[in-house]
Amino acid sequence: MDQTTPQLRCSVGVTAYNEEANIGRLLDALLSQQLHVVDISEIIVVASGCTDNTIPIVESFVAREPRVRLFVQPKREGKTAAVNVFLSNAVEDICVLESGDTIPHPDAVEHMVRMFADPAV
């Protein structure tokens, strides 16, 4: 990619319900993605009705990584409501959704987003 080609910017959303066992590894994996033509502008975590340590774990990431944002739904409202919170607050037109119980491949975001460089998409 030459210097005149713009980066593709995306927002990544994570929906989470009681994911203390995985959320830290997931955020580490997202923050260390191998990116060439894609830039992750923000990672929005929507914690819905969590009763474990998911929220404090995410708060520790928020404190040290400005791209990580946390939205808390005190009552569990379901995945659709959490996705709507993400989409309502995302700053980019390209949005990638992850579930709190996954670990993406090191170049997963690049592979999902880079197709948007094609004007036909």
Residue positions per predicted region:
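Short, acidic, metal-binding catalytic loop of nucleotide-sugar glycosyltransferases
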Residues: 28-40
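Short beta-strand/loop segment that forms part of the nucleotide-sugar
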Residues: 39-49, 71-73
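Glycine-rich, basic loop-to-helix element that forms the pyrophosphate-binding segment
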Residues: 73-90
